[in-house]
UniProtKB/Swiss-Prot annotation:
Subunit text: Homodimer.
Example GO biological process: tricarboxylic acid cycle
Record protein name field: Malate dehydrogenase
A Pfam family annotated for this UniProt entry: Ldh_1_N
Binding positions for NAD(+) per the UniProt entry: G7, A8, A9, G10, G11, I12, G13, D34, N94, I117, T118, N119, M227
Keywords, alphabetical: NAD, Oxidoreductase, Tricarboxylic acid cycle
Keyword match Plastid: no
Length: 311
């Protein structure tokens, strides 16, 4: 199994590479690519960690050597948020980066599962889909927007509030991956009850947690370490499912039946070909139903921007 991390010299990429070097199954290949010349050095550094995962680093303009034979490609390339920016401010730079990388994937490893981390995810996933479609290789079961950070934040904050072990908390998060489009389904957390006040406070905290980190880092970056952990969790789940493990479920932003929007995050059963089944997210509370309805215009608008960028 070969996993390629694209954007591997950045804050998310390095954290993700470290975690994957430690946690990928024995015999896996890990390829790191970034435009930055430091990338082979990042791989050399990680290669000294004693795990049965082989690692190679590539730099320069062309990601092809890193992509060749990849089963999973995780894209974290692009610029990070700074104070005062929201995820959509990143669009002007990151849209072009995702477009050109996806064009390379379409030629080099068109059958790979692709996990997009680069923000704004609501839009960059639509860009990747349109690029793959133009190249005649689009498989909607193999393209994912990685929204796992919203899930792990939800699990952490719920566990803190309710004094539980975060490893035992599961919170489905649906919608998209920015601001109001992030909808944690607190009504569905097993074994935990919330007051209306708790839901009203916790929901925006989860939605704005990225901004919390951007401001706390005071211009020194955005959420890189927790995002690395989230991307590792999603990447490992993909690897397990592709290897034949049954019952692997993660929330992700994928093209489904289009009920709410062309792309929508909800629980996905993963399998040998990527998306095995898009699972129902169950019944929503009145609060969640209202939040869902009021976010859809924003989400659809984000998707449209991505589609039009490639036209």
């Amino acid at each position: 199994m070969k996993v390629a991390v694209i954007g591997a010299a950045g804050g998310i990429g390095q954290a993700l590479a470290l975690l994957l070097k430690n946690r990928l199954p024995a015999g896996s290949d890990l390829a790191l690519y970034d435009i930055a010349p430091v990338t082979p050095g990042v791989a050399a550094d990680l290669s000294h960690i004693p795990t049965p995962v082989s690692i190679k680093g590539y730099c320069g303009e062309d990601p092809t050597p890193a992509l060749e034979g990849a089963d999973v490609v995780l894209i974290s390339a692009g610029v990070a948020r700074k104070p005062g920016m929201d995820r959509s401010d990143l669009f002007n730079i990151n849209a072009g980066i995702v477009k050109s990388l996806t064009e390379k994937i379409a030629v080099t490893c068109p059958k790979a599962c692709i996990g997009i981390i680069t923000n704004p995810v609501n839009t960059t996933v639509a860009i990747a889909a349109e690029v793959l479609k133009k190249a005649g290789v689009y498989d909607k079961n193999k393209l994912f927007g990685v929204t796992t950070l919203d899930v792990i934040r939800s699990e952490t904050f719920v566990a803190e509030l309710k004094d539980k072990d975060p490893g035992e908390i599961r919170v489905p998060v649906i919608g998209g991956h920015s601001g109001v489009t992030i909808l944690p389904l607190l009504s569905q957390v097993e074994g935990v009850e919330f007051t209306a006040e708790e839901v009203a406070a916790l929901t925006p905290r989860i939605q704005n947690a990225g901004t919390e980190v951007v401001e706390a880092k005071a211009g020194g970056g955005s959420a890189t370490l927790s995002m690395g952990q989230a991307a590792c969790r999603f990447g490992l789940s993909l690897v397990k499912a592709l290897s034949g493990e049954q019952g692997v479920v993660e929330c992700a932003y994928v093209e489904g039946n289009g009920e709410h929007a062309r792309f929508f995050a909800q629980p996905i059963l993963l399998g040998k070909n990527g998306v095995e089944e898009i699972q129902s997210y169950g019944e929503l509370s009145a609060f969640e139903q209202e939040a869902l309805e009021s976010m859809l215009d924003t989400l659809r608008g984000d998707i449209k921007i991505g589609e039009e960028f490639v036209q």
